[in-house]
């Protein structure tokens, strides 16, 4: 089997049917991939919704398993442990794959047999509409990711996002999968950066990571949920994860990250002033707040 697609879910029962159906109706058919759905200790009716969906969508290889240890990294590793595919693909529970998603993944693998890791485009699907205060820079907090218009290698330390990334299973196993000290989402707590560290380990082995915009998912974003508290959790989680990751390297790496974040904070202030001068003041505060919250996460306990 070529591909194992792993979806990890925590209390997203209202989203999972759309995610699963988008894979069920792939143009490639269902023969060359499996789907492993990992319930990460949900307290809602995720299990029942999955079972109901599967009763009416009986073809293909779909497996439901549970991981009681809270955290996306734990759940992803559990899914990967039973994967039968030569490649493991990670997709979020609130993502919807485009019709040719699997077809384009397999084509990318066939066209570049030397690759070991790559990722694709993520397009936010705002419900009901993109808020006026949203900017390109802040949109990364809701999963917006469009690295290039054509397939290419990632450069300058860039890497795919966890919600649309593919890794050769043998290499994934070689580096030990996701670092559970960077668990991702644990209830309302976020400690991010798990995908970044994983790809940096692959790069350290001498490999290049690639991007292909034809490998695309839509990420559902309910605007009513984008409260200041939610945005703080996401942004501070990025900083918190970078603290864990860099301290694991050295104190010097952590200090350099602090300097980097201070420079980004300064750049955000300049960008906010630019938005005001351009007549879009609603975008100014969020872009500055993003860097403040990320810095709090980096400096916090």
Language model region names:
Residues 12-26:
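Short, well-formed alpha-helical segments that are part of the catalytic scaffolds
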